[in-house]
């Protein structure tokens, strides 16, 4: 399969290749919106770099998905090194999980070029990545759509750009493009937002970390407004509208398993995906969802990253959050482009009121 880069993809690839070929020793970041084709950028960088390149992925599912895309672009001098994926092949280009690599560090001494997908997940204070970076000869570039980390301070939790935290792993952004730019060029799907929440989040306490809402307090607010009734009711309306065409597929983000179970008990052809769903069952459900055999998927704490389904046209947000990154990742599931698609964001959680349209979010690097 041959491919042609869009202008912003070429600019991102050029920036990475320039850094890898330079004598710079800093760790850099490339920021590309969800749906911008990050996997293609990674593939192009890999094809242009001389010598070994290791590409770290945050999960088995994303690793397998992006590795398959790499090979679909005609790049075959590549391998997978991941215990969870059941493969330990080292090649010039190696897609890997950090845990598997750190158990056999000596195998990877010759890898001096490093890409890290979803790099906002890297802990700058401790962990396996920090140990891996201690080799000063390595050049590291991270890629993300959400370059933020939640940091604690005297005033409570604060969202900071990952190049401005203390300590920090990444020092500078070498390339970024805005969501609004890609929308204007037709590279992302247009979105329509429906703000219909009944929740009063001022009644909900923040958890002990300051990062998000307290679960017990949030559950009490859910029960006060009977959010379960609203989730079921709006899902039925989306499946059987009084006018217009029913939505192609509906992905619902819930906070607790009980909302998902309520949906599954009242909505025919609704499946549940959670962290405890067996891998084979999860794969079967998502295949059925993409094939159109399953119309509704209620997911609990998963499918916020790496779920690639461009035809998806509707998400229902029933998971309140204080995390801008999480909000963006959830909306990002429906912003991927598909011909003739208008993505719908049906918000029962108050997230839209807190953060607004993702199209209006801007990355300011200065």
Residue map of PLM features:
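Conserved interdomain linker/interface between the two RecA-like ATPase lobes of SF2 helicase motors
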Residues: 171-251
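Conserved RecA-like P-loop NTPase helicase motor core
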Residues: 99-105, 275-363
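Walker A/P-loop
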Residues: 22-45, 249, 253, 273, ...
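Post-DEXD/H (motif II) to motif III coupling segment of the RecA-like Helicase ATP-binding lobe
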Residues: 121-193
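Inter-Walker segment of RecA-like/P-loop motor cores
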Residues: 71-106
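Conserved Walker A/P-loop ATP-binding site and its immediately adjacent core
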Residues: 34, 40-72, 255-258
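Conserved pre-motif I regulatory segment
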Residues: 1-31
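Conserved helicase ATPase core of P-loop NTP-dependent helicases/translocases
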Residues: 64, 78-90, 251, 259-263, ...
């Amino acid at each position: 399969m041959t491919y042609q880069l869009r202008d912003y993809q070429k600019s991102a690839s050029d920036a990475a290749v320039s850094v890898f070929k330079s004598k710079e020793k800093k760790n850099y970041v490339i920021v590309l919106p969800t749906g911008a084709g990050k996997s293609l950028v990674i593939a192009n960088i890999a094809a242009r770099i001389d010598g070994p390149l290791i590409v770290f992925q945050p999960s088995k599912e994303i690793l397998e998905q992006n590795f398959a895309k790499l090979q679909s672009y005609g790049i075959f001098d590549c391998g997978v090194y991941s215990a969870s994926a059941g493969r330990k092949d080292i090649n010039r280009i190696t897609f890997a999980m950090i845990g598997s690599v750190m158990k056999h560090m000596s195998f990877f001494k010759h890898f001096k070029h490093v890409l890290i997908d979803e790099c906002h997940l890297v802990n700058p204070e401790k962990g396996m990545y920090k140990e891996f970076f201690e080799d000063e000869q390595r050049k590291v570039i991270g890629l993300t759509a959400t370059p933020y980390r939640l940091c604690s301070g005297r005033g409570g939790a604060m969202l900071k750009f990952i190049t401005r935290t203390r300590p920090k792993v990444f020092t500078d952004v070498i390339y970024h493009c805005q969501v609004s730019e890609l929308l204007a060029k037709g590279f992302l799907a247009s979105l329509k937002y429906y703000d219909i929440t009944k929740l009063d989040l001022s009644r909900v306490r923040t958890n002990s970390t300051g990062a998000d809402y307290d679960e017990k307090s949030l559950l009490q607010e859910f029960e006060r407004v009977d959010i379960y009734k609203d989730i079921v009711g709006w899902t039925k309306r989306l499946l059987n509208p009084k006018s217009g065409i029913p939505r192609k597929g509906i992905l619902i983000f819930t906070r607790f398993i009980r909302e998902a179970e309520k949906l599954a008990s009242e909505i025919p052809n609704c499946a549940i995906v959670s962290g405890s769903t067996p891998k084979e069952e999860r794969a079967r459900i998502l295949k059925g969802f993409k094939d159109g055999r399953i119309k509704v998927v209620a997911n609990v704490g998963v499918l916020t990253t790496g779920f690639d389904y461009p035809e998806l046209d509707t998400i229902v947000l029933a998971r309140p959050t204080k995390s801008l990154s999480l909000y963006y990742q959830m909306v990002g599931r429906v912003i991927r482009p598909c011909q003739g698609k208008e993505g719908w964001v049906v918000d029962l959680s108050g997230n839209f009121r807190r953060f607004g349209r993702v199209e209006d979010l801007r990355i300011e690097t200065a």
